[in-house]
Structures are given as C-alpha cells and as structure tokens.
Amino acid sequence: MIPVKVENNTSLDQVQDALNCVGYAVVEDVLDEASLAATRDRMYRVQERILTEIGKERLARAGELGVLRLMMKYDPHFFTFLEIPEVLSIVDRVLSETAILHLQNGFILPSFPPFSTPDVFQNAFHQDFPRVLSGYIASVNIMFAIDPFTRDTGATLVVPGSHQRIEKPDHTYLARNAVPVQCAAGSLFVFDSTLWHAAGRNTSGKDRLAINHQFTRSFFKQQIDYVRALGDAVVLEQPARTQQLLGWYSRVVTNLDEYYQPPDKRLYRKGQG
C-alpha cells in the first residue's frame, strides 16, 4: 500500500479526509535542505549534552533507542518547529487554536544488522493517545522526516484505518497489515494519535533522524511541563503562539494570589477548552 500523500500548500481538507479515513497523511517538501542539515547537526549536539547530563547508564535503563527529550532546553533551534505554518495550520484544523504541545521528541534511530534490533516499546505496536472518545479528536502527531524514511532506514509502520477503535486489533492483524510510511527527507507525517503504529527497524548502516510532535487539547497534561522545564524567561522570549503551545496559558495556579488575578494575568486563560 502506498502512503497517503498530499502536496504542500494543498487544501487542508485533503489532510483532514486522510486522517478521518485511514488515520494518517504525508505532506512533502516542508523543510528545505539547509534546514535539514542544520537540524541534523544540532540533534547530535543535543544528544551529547543529554548524555553528559543524564549519563549513559540511566539512559540505557530507560530502554529507548535514540530518543531525545526536551531538545528545546539544549538548543533554541527546536523552538522553530512550533512556528512552521504547515504545523500550525494542521493543529488549528484538527484540534484547536488553543491546543498545546504534549511532547517534542527527537529520534536518532541507530542501525542494527537484520534481526538484531532490540525489542523496545518504540518498535512494538502502540497508540500515542490510548483513549477513544466517541470520535472526539483530542490528540494529533506531526513527525518530521529529517532523513529519508524507507524500509531500510526504519520508516514508521502504521496500520491504516486502525485509529479511533476502542478495542486493540489482534497482533497478527497489526503485523500483517502494517505499512511503512516511506517519504523523502523534509516531509511531514501527520497521524491521529490513536492510530496503531510502531517504529521500524533500521538496517541501513547509518542513523535515521526524525522529530515527533504530539499536540493535544489544552486540558490534557503534558509529558513534560515545558514552562517549568524551560523557565518563564525563556518561554516569554518566544512568539505568543509558541507560548500558547508550550502551555503558558494553561498553567495550574499554586496559591490564591495567582488565582485572584485580572483576566490578562491569569495563569489559566479563558477559552482554553
């Protein structure tokens, strides 16, 4: 099965239709080569900083393959992904203008010889948002292919039409009907967060890089409290829309002084539903 692709600058109706029908879509030519090259370099630098701060042993115990969390803390380059017009248009259309970033994770997926990739959560079939709410879309993922997604590089496997299902499909069905989302570097891969998917297995002989974003309605807790993790000063340096996505307008008060504030100073602003 060929991945569902729509051309950049096309009507959002096509993206919405693909999400409704099969649960995912690919938008090509979003990032140019200069941006890709800069992002690759910066991801490796962030990986080194995380390794230094957390330590190889603790990272190994987590049972992850090349996951980079909280990249914005280590390099402001990664804030710019929250300003990309295609990202904002999809988030606004599928969720809401008040949606927030649940996570931004980089992936430097290492290569292994065939049949020797460790079994971890990433390459088991799963949903990023395991809650089906009677057709109510509460979460959407937007992943950037920083390197080409192919069978050999470990393109993400998706099971078309498996989204918005209350019961988990049989594992045999998932394995037999999964298709790799193959796309060029610079493409954007968007999917309903209830879609069953798994990381592919990279046997290409080199790393494969990607960045995944998950956006939710503002009343769902983030994987990381980005406002606290980054600090008020850093968040306030960002554009207003980025502040919104980071959760600046949906913070939880901690005392009565914070609670009894005028509308323009409240931590949890009106209309964040």
Swiss-Prot record:
Belongs to the PhyH family. PANTHER family: ECTOINE DIOXYGENASE, PHYTANOYL-COA DIOXYGENASE DOMAIN CONTAINING 1. InterPro entries: Phytyl_CoA_dOase-like. This is Uncharacterized protein Mb1539. It comes from the Bacteria. GO terms for molecular function: 2-oxoglutarate-dependent dioxygenase activity; iron ion binding. Pfam families: PhyH.
